[in-house]
Swiss-Prot record:
The gene is ptfB. It is found in: Cytoplasm. It comes from Haloferax volcanii (strain ATCC 29605 / DSM 3757 / JCM 8879 / NBRC 14742 / NCIMB 2012 / VKM B-1768 / DS2) (Halobacterium volcanii). Signal peptide: none annotated. Its EC number is 2.7.1.202. The phosphoenolpyruvate-dependent sugar phosphotransferase system (sugar PTS), a major carbohydrate active transport system, catalyzes the phosphorylation of incoming sugar substrates concomitantly with their translocation across the cell membrane. The enzyme II PtfABC PTS system is involved in fructose transport. GO terms for molecular function: kinase activity; protein-N(PI)-phosphohistidine-fructose phosphotransferase system transporter activity; protein-phosphocysteine-sugar phosphotransferase activity. Residues 104-147 are annotated as: Disordered. This is PTS system fructose-specific EIIB component. SUPFAM superfamilies: PTS system IIB component-like (SSF52794). Residues 137-147 have a biased composition (Basic and acidic residues). The PTS EIIB type-2 domain is phosphorylated by phospho-EIIA on a cysteinyl residue. Then, it transfers the phosphoryl group to the sugar substrate concomitantly with the sugar uptake processed by the PTS EIIC type-2 domain. It is an enzyme of class 2 (transferase). PANTHER family: FRUCTOSE-LIKE PERMEASE, FRUCTOSE-LIKE PTS SYSTEM EIIBC COMPONENT-RELATED.
Amino acid sequence: MKLVAVTSCPTGIAHSQMAAENLLQAGERLGHDIDVEVQGAMGTQDELASDAIAEADAVIITSDTSVSRDRFDGKLVLKGTVKDGVNNAEAVVQKAVELAEAGKTGSVTFGSGDDGEDADVGADDSSDDADAAESDEPVRRGGDPEKGLFARLKKLFS
């Protein structure tokens, strides 16, 4: 089966790279052809070709940031967090294959994602997300913004 994936995190240095590597290894181990694009603070690496997207049976997005889905119209798109890609890559690939073989299209959120129809991949964090969704306060991800990559770069260049 042909799969494409996009990983992205706010800094794009470690976690998105680890998720990409784990998804590649899991796809190969399960006998599937998978291409992975990494989006981070420094731009996009291994950008998915339009041909690869057109041939794909499913799209996997493991991201803690916003990823444009326009180029994936008409495809099965599975959305989860970078944590899902790092910790549960094999289960994520298996879920994508299962849904694609069933002929599903559209968007499905899995794992520790926020609002999906299907949350059984890596569901150990689902109760935390349900509590966060019920409160009126926004969910904040990441560390202290004063200590992040952008803050350090700003200090370096000012």
